[in-house]
Amino acid sequence: MSKQEVILCESLETSLGRAIERCPHDKLFILTDEHTQRLCLPSLKEVSFLKDAVEICIGAEDVHKTLETLASVWMALSQQGATRHSLLINLGGGMVTDLGGFAAATFKRGISYINIPTTLLAMVDASVGGKTGINFNGLKNEIGSFAPADSVLIETEFLRSLDAQNFFSGYAEMLKHGLISNTAHWVELLDFNTNNIDYAYLKNMVGRSVQVKEDIVEQDPFERGIRKALNLGHTAGHAFESLALAENRPVLHGYAVAWGIVCELYLSHLKVGFPKDKMRQTIQFIKENYGSFAFDCKQYEQLYAFMQHDKKNTSGTVNFTLLKEIGDICINQTADKDTIFEML
């Protein structure tokens, strides 16, 4: 898998101009959702080299991350004359970069694309690393491919218009990166004043968080080994997310991951000895900022069934990423049903 270029922008217009120059193309398309079309696209439409770009807009939120939406993007590309040499720019959050990346990867067997993430979650996670896809049959990211963007352009000025819930959704992935990397990054994430955001310092933290993911992806682009470290919190988290969708009470991805981290740090303590004090500090931070996911023991079987569908599983066992210590990662860990119920 080719290595994508990730740029923490000083000037989005300059960085985008250079990224487009590196991708020779016959036609340019911009994919947005209803929110980014209104809030983010106007600042780019003034750029001269985008004046002829064809706009494609899809519904916002994860409920639109579907085969039907994907087909509508394919249809728009086809009807507007896209060829194998066209270029797609994805301007949006994780849903847009995931679905747009998959549309680009599959249209005419693959066209070039650029990601411009507009949410914190997309900046530190979804747009980086080459994973693309859609939800299917009630399961998160069930259909997709590894297809890295040619460039990922991170403009943290977009974060100034982000609401608190979407800020914390992305921050959960940053917290995960702190846990799997080093104590210093973990501490700065717990100590950061989320009530009075210093955006200059946040930009630096975003850079460090992205670097954690980039370093891991470069070692293991297709998730056969160490890249599974990035799944901390996601086995339980995806189960919470799928249950919430099934019950028509969708939750933001990062909130599900945060609740998944609570479960999987407890499992880490049980199985591999993750320190109780660091587990409690992290869980306290999550409880204060994310609350808790409402479910009861009657739903354990359903949550367990969702975990059994997780893509990381092998030979019928539920696979977890656990921690012995901050930065000391244990991949390919399993737990039996009783232990998983105790974790929940």
Summary of predicted features, one role per range:
Residues F102-T194:
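A glycine/threonine-rich phosphate-anchoring loop and its flanking beta-alpha core
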Residues A82, P148-S151, E157-A164, A172-A184, ...:
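Generic secondary-structure signature for well-ordered alpha-helical cores
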Residues F192-E301:
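Active-site segments that bind and position negatively charged phosphate/pyrophosphate groups
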Residues M174, F274-L344:
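C-terminal charged capping/lid subdomain of soluble metabolic enzymes
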Residues M1-L87:
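ATP/NTP phosphate-donor binding region
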Residues L77-L91, D98-N115:
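Non-catalytic interfacial helical region
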Residues M95-G101, M123, A239:
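Short glycine/serine/threonine-rich phosphate/pyrophosphate-binding segments
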